[in-house]
């Protein structure tokens, strides 16, 4: 059952108040935070204020929406007016934005209760949340492992029930990869469906804000609250927003699902491949037609991304110079101040990407690197377009392996390979969702479902059908009973219904 729906029912029947729910989640957050370190800033005072406002509306007989009174965590690269927004960087350690991001403003207007700002890789550059300047977030399933990144704090907070849902950002997999590592659902929407106004930019043509939740329905409800045109974002799409809850039908008979052959081969771990193949077979048992799809340009996705994204980052991060806001190091000249401020303010990974991007954009190498990468990006988009002429959605593993040990991947290339399967979706601007499809040695494995432009409803429908016929999403990390189950007195730790690891029947395409 959707956690949002269950809590909403308790609120409207006055079984519990929004303040009671907020206090329970804040208590659990505080209890687990020394172990997990999911949050950079906890906004207890704001949360209780927002919860009391919802209770006042209920007492006045006002009808509340499904998001009212629901505890929310926000990735700390989304600007929140009057609340510290650091991007997990020394550069913005004390920065308090004078304005609010569109997505957080919309959710506040819907009555959501913000419990805090979550940890991330510095400026959203990383795949493990180890690049934060302040702390390393732990994976709730195994505290010695990473939660993924860059939205690792948001994923860990939802997995550990420190919040019901969370916001993240996804530039090359930063919602889907940590969702897979932490055993929750994460969605990167179509580029332009959700406003980026107030999201601190990493790579502007790739960044997208999206939701985390325990269930597909929770993610659909949060997406409903943030999707839609925003005149403050020049890349925002002017399209009609459907009711995503209407897509949640556990019936996919006749759906054509493409299996991306290129992402199930070399580079994919054996346990991950087995779990995803079992999930594909299960989708076939639900009535879907399975086709194998070739996307040959995907093999160049990683190289393409690591030219385009750092190039955009080198431009976007030029604004952090110590002049208008953020860190400023004293120096004898303006040029020296720039150098000292950026040397102290940025961490190693951010500096690395700025250097790569500056090199790719330099006069002698622009055509050889940046321009060529943009051409390959077009080829990747064309591969997707050809695939969607034959199928409704595509599926693949979300990550090559389950979560790895903290400190295990110090080599940048081995870290970059974590996003091998998610990057093509960002380069094409498509919607992609990760949901749990199995476990290996007690660690979650994610199934990625990819849709065509603005086809979030199809992605959600396939994800919902799979979720409702399995029990993977009901498993909980070994961290004690979460607030909702305490209130209901029903702790659950079921086994999944679908255990088959045999390959599915496929027709070649």
UniProtKB/Swiss-Prot annotation:
The UniProt entry's GO biological process terms, in alphabetical order, are: translation
What are the alphabetically sorted keywords of the record? Answer: ATP-binding, Ligase, Nucleotide-binding, Protein biosynthesis
The source's domain of life comes to Bacteria
Q: Which reaction does it catalyse?
A: L-glutamyl-tRNA(Gln) + L-glutamine + ATP + H2O = L-glutaminyl-tRNA(Gln) + L-glutamate + ADP + phosphate + H(+)
- EC code: 6.3.5.7
GO CC term (a single one): glutamyl-tRNA(Gln) amidotransferase complex
Entries under SUPFAM superfamilies matching the protein: Amidase signature (AS) enzymes
Q: Could you tell me which Gene3D superfamilies the record lists for this protein?
A: Amidase signature (AS) domain
Q: Where is the composition biased (Basic residues)?
A: 496-509
Active site as annotated:
75, 150, 174
User: One GO molecular-function annotation for this sequence?
Assistant: glutaminyl-tRNA synthase (glutamine-hydrolyzing) activity
Top enzyme class of this protein?
Answer: ligase
Start and end residues of each stretch annotated as Disordered:
471-509
* Family recorded in the similarity comment: Belongs to the amidase family. GatA subfamily.
Self-association state and partner proteins as the record states = Heterotrimer of A, B and C subunits.
As for what it does, the entry says: Allows the formation of correctly charged Gln-tRNA(Gln) through the transamidation of misacylated Glu-tRNA(Gln) in organisms which lack glutaminyl-tRNA synthetase. The reaction takes place in the presence of glutamine and ATP through an activated gamma-phospho-Glu-tRNA(Gln).
This protein's name? Glutamyl-tRNA(Gln) amidotransferase subunit A
């Amino acid at each position: 059952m959707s956690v949002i729906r269950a809590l909403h029912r308790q609120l409207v029947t006055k079984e519990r108040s929004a303040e009671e729910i907020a206090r329970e989640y804040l208590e659990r957050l505080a209890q687990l935070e020394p172990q997990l370190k999911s949050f950079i800033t906890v906004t207890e005072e704001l949360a209780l204020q927002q919860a009391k406002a919802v209770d006042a509306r209920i007492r006045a007989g006002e009808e509340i929406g499904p998001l009212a009174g629901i505890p929310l965590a926000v990735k700390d690269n989304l600007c929140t007016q009057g609340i510290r927004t650091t991007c997990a960087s020394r550069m913005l350690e004390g920065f308090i934005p004078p304005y609010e991001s569109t997505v957080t403003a919309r959710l506040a207007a819907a009555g959501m209760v913000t419990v805090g700002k979550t940890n991330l890789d510095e400026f959203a550059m990383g795949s493990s949340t180890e690049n934060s300047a302040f702390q390393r977030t732990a994976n709730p399933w195994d505290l010695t492992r990473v939660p993924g990144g860059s939205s690792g704090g948001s994923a860990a907070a939802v997995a550990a029930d420190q919040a019901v849902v969370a916001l993240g950002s996804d530039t090359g997999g930063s919602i889907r990869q940590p969702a897979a590592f932490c055993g929750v659902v994460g969605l990167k929407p179509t580029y332009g469906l959700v406003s980026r106004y107030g999201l601190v930019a990493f790579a502007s043509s790739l960044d997208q804000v999206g939701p985390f939740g325990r269930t597909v329905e929770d993610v659909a409800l949060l997406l409903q609250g943030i999707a839609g045109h925003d005149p403050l974002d020049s890349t925002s799409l002017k399209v009609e927003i459907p009711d995503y809850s209407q897509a949640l039908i556990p019936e996919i008979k006749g759906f054509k699902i493409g299996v991306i052959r290129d992402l199930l081969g070399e580079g994919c771990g054996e346990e991950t491949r087995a779990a995803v193949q079992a999930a594909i077979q299960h989708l076939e048992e639900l009535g879907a037609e399975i086709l194998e799809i070739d996307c040959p340009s995907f093999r160049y996705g990683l190289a393409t991304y690591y030219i385009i994204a750092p190039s955009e980052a080198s431009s976007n991060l030029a604004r952090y110079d110590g002049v208008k806001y953020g860190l400023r190091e004293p120096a004898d000249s303006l040029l020296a101040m720039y150098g000292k401020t950026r040397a102290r303010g940025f961490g190693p990974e951010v500096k690395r990407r700025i250097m790569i991007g500056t090199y790719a954009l330099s006069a002698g190498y622009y055509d050889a690197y940046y321009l060529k990468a943009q051409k390959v990006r077009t080829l990747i988009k064309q591969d997707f377009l050809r695939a969607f002429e034959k199928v409704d959605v595509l599926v693949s593993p979300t990550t090559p392996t389950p979560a790895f040990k903290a400190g295990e991947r110090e080599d940048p290339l081995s870290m970059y390979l974590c996003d091998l399967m998610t990057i093509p979706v960002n380069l094409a601007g498509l919607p992609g969702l990760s949901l749990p499809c199995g476990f290996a040695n007690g660690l979650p494995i994610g199934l990625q479902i990819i849709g065509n432009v603005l086809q979030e409803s199809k992605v959600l429908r396939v994800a919902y059908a799979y979720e409702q016929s399995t029990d993977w999403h009901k498993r909980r990390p070994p961290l004690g009973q979460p607030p909702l189950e305490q209130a209901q007195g029903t702790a659950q730790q079921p086994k999944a219904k679908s255990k088959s690891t045999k390959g599915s029947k496929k027709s070649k395409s």
